[in-house]
């Protein structure tokens, strides 16, 4: 789900199954990074995507009661579009997003990639997610956390949980 530079009111994404999000990119254009060199990059390569929900400059986004899984990159990713302004308007900040009571399942890079800590996450369940799956990208360097650190350092997901079980969604039969 892509929502772009919405600045007015609240936008709600609720009660969805978002599954097997591979993204649109040419895998041949992704450079091979030996060893841990990719761990120290300050930003993502521009050809990789695969976000379950992608907020581009959208403020006041509410993401509630969704099952988001098997995403190539992240279940939720947002970035500001600071210079997308016309006339007397401002750019999009991607702040005041609230991710509430969602299940994030085995997203390859991260369950959540928030642009800043000016957002909220509460009551989410993270299933089959591995190290550094909760991220705040700015100010740089990004922080890559697990649930206990997310709770301790940012006060996010105090009612959140981690779990390890299998989910199988039949995308043909929608079951």
Identify the residue ranges that each predicted region occupies.
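Glycine- and acidic/polar-rich repeat regions and solenoidal domains
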Residues: 1-174
């Amino acid at each position: 789900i892509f929502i772009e530079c919405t600045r007015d009111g609240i936008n709600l994404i609720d009660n969805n199954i978002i599954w097997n999000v591979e993204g649109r990119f040419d895998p041949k254009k992704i450079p091979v990074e030996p060893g841990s060199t990719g761990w120290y990059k300050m930003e993502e390569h521009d050809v990789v995507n695969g976000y379950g929900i992608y907020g581009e400059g959208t403020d006041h986004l509410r993401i509630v009661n969704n099952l988001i899984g098997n995403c190539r990159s992240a279940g939720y990713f947002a970035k500001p579009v600071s210079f997308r302004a016309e006339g007397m308007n401002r750019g999009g900040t991607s702040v005041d997003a609230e991710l509430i009571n969602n299940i994030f399942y085995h997203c390859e890079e991260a369950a959540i990639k928030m642009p800043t800590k000016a957002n909220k996450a509460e009551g989410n369940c993270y299933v089959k997610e591995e190290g550094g799956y909760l991220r705040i990208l700015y100010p740089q360097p990004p922080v890559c956390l697990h649930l206990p650190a997310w709770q301790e350092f940012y006060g996010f997901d105090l009612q959140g949980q981690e779990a390890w079980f299998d989910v199988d969604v039949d995308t043909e039969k929608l079951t």
